Amino acid sequence: MAKIKKKGTSGAAKNYITRTQAVRKLQISLPDFRRLCIFKGIYPREPRNKKKASKTSTPSTTFYYTRDIQYLLHEPLLKRFRDQKALSKKIARSLGRGDVGDAARLEKNNAPKITLDHIVKERYPTFIDALRDLDDALSLLFLFANLPSTANVPPKTIALCQRLCHEFQHYLIATNSLRKSFLSIKGIYYQATIQGQDILWLVPYRFVQQVTGDVDYRIMATFVEFYTTLLGFVNFRLYTSIGLVYPPKFDSRSDERGAELAAFTLEGRKVGEMQKAISSEPQTNGQLAKSDSAANDIQAKVDNILKETTRNNEPDDEAVDVEDNVDAIDKFETTAPEADTLPQPQMSGNEVASLFASFTFFISREAPRGPLEFLLRAFGCKRVGWDAVLGEGAFTHDETDPRITHQIVDRPPLPESALPPLPQNPGEGAEKAPRVRPGTRMPGRMYIQPQWVWDCVNEGKLLRHDLYAPGATLPPHLSPWVKASKGGYDPRLSLAEQESDGEAERQAEEENEEEESEVEGLSMDKEMVETENSEAGESDEESVDGGMDVDIPGSDDEEEESEEDNALRELGGSDEAADVQSESEDDEEAARNQHQMELEAEAAGLPFTGADGTGTSSKKSKKQKPLAKKHAAQKKKEQEELERQKMMMSRKKRKLLDKMLYSNKKKDEEAEKLRRKRRKIEQGTKGR
């Protein structure tokens, strides 16, 4: 006889454990358990059947894998948490005795320090794994770097996040690893490629953030504590991989005066220092290390060899011309008009990296200096100036500098009379650079709006300046990660290039019909008001006549006569009526339906807008427009052809085709809706 299984020893009851059981098993508090799970990357699980997973009658809401909790039993942080718990008891005991000094001494000297280095190495065995998990870390750290300091967000945490983020930005600038950027409602998206891994993160706009109380900053602070350690490891590895010293030199005074990126100074590892480090190591064979003079002699010989090779490899002018022609990017064009668009080769990374290298930019004080400076420097610009109000670290604070080739402005063009006058005698502490009147144009300089920088970066080339001039209507700013699909709406193209045949004419006909129906509705409302007034007058006359019945045209007697005439026509009492009925059956059916709708509307007390009393609207509704009729016939023909083709398919392929057709239909309807909206806007603009 088989042994009876004990309940709760196998299946879901064994694989899952509740949060209360896990906390009791680890012997730590619930907040420490949350922190430990965040550090180790352990999150709750959802069993298929909560009743089977729970060993009690009351179903629990939070479950974890039993093997994950068993794995946490060997974590060194548990000892730190228990030491912190014991220290808290000692501090509480000292405060209970009134010994505040002893409590402060215990907190200062005996507080356990928590390090997360081993957890970072454990969770990310390779550097590529750390890069793949860097998206959320960058988004959260950039968020905290822009938050105001509160009791929940101390200034020390904000300063640490800002320093790590600026160090990461300096690496992107030094290696030209930034690829795309997009301005959205949530903030600014950036995408960089590091060692073949695409990293996408979000940076909020620098508005005044209102910190609310419904956000649990303790949980977010735990993530920040782990992500700062992770980003510190990543920055160290990135800097050392390109031969830079980490951490870079940081000038706190410049940072206090708003230098931001300019407060950091990057330094490369010197060859002499590396040789000294190598020479100071003990030799295994007992020989002494080489002296510095010998190392310098070797380095001098290597430098001479490199100079000779570079001198011999210098090409002539003709060779350069040939290489330029060879390296030119070919453009692949389709021969057939209906062929697919061939993917075109793009510029190399070096050309895109030096996109703004030959320009000198000046950022006006109303433009966002931080993201613009980062983008311009990441794509090769070495000379970026801005107004002195925006902080230190600029190439120039003089707006009249003749070396400036592009000025980024984000202000509307105002008349000269609306501008305030400049102070003639600037007070003490004013800027030494001469002030320029707002709206003044300097000769030999391009004035552009900030979107020009983002669009040039996403397109990988310099765009036209006149489209982004101050006060001009900007082109649509599209996401660089969304590719235009065939048949979809593309705001960069004109309506004539993407609309179907006769789409504009059909929409014009629909608009005309809507206008006619609105006019007919207004006329019907007026007639209803007039009839109500006439009925009120007749009721007054009836009351004056003593309640006598008065024959009114269009009363029930006429309706009865019309019903009798219809009955006679059905019986065939009159040959002439039968001939009329055979010739105009459709007209009678339409009139009968219209009459029925009129009666229903009258009984409900609503105006009937389908007819104006003379029958002209019914004729208009019956008569279709030629373009709409032609389009409907074409659609019907295409649908019939498609149904014939579907008959030859299997059931599986037919279902797949139906899904594809349904999704394509939804996309076409959405694109047509957007084109219609744009057409109305353009027509309204032309009408003005």
UniProtKB/Swiss-Prot annotation:
GO terms for molecular function: ribonucleoprotein complex binding; RNA binding. The keyword Flavoprotein does not apply. HAMAP family: Pescadillo (MF_03028). It is found in: Nucleus, Nucleolus; Nucleus, Nucleoplasm. Residues 412-424 have a biased composition (Pro residues). Residues 496-536, 627-686 form a coiled coil. SUPFAM superfamilies: BRCT domain. GO terms for biological process: maturation of 5.8S rRNA from tricistronic rRNA transcript (SSU-rRNA, 5.8S rRNA, LSU-rRNA); maturation of LSU-rRNA from tricistronic rRNA transcript (SSU-rRNA, 5.8S rRNA, LSU-rRNA). Keywords: Coiled coil, Nucleus, Ribosome biogenesis, rRNA processing. Residues 411-442, 496-688 are annotated as: Disordered. Component of the NOP7 complex, composed of ERB1, NOP7 and YTM1. The complex is held together by ERB1, which interacts with NOP7 via its N-terminal domain and with YTM1 via a high-affinity interaction between the seven-bladed beta-propeller domains of the 2 proteins. The NOP7 complex associates with the 66S pre-ribosome. Residues 510-519, 530-544, 554-565, 576-589 have a biased composition (Acidic residues). Pfam families: Pescadillo_N. It comes from Coccidioides immitis (strain RS) (Valley fever fungus). It comes from the Eukaryota. Residues 619-634 have a biased composition (Basic residues). GO terms for cellular component: nucleoplasm; PeBoW complex; preribosome, large subunit precursor. Signal peptide: none annotated. Residues 351-470 form the BRCT domain. This is Pescadillo homolog. Component of the NOP7 complex, which is required for maturation of the 25S and 5.8S ribosomal RNAs and formation of the 60S ribosome. Residues 635-646 have a biased composition (Basic and acidic residues).
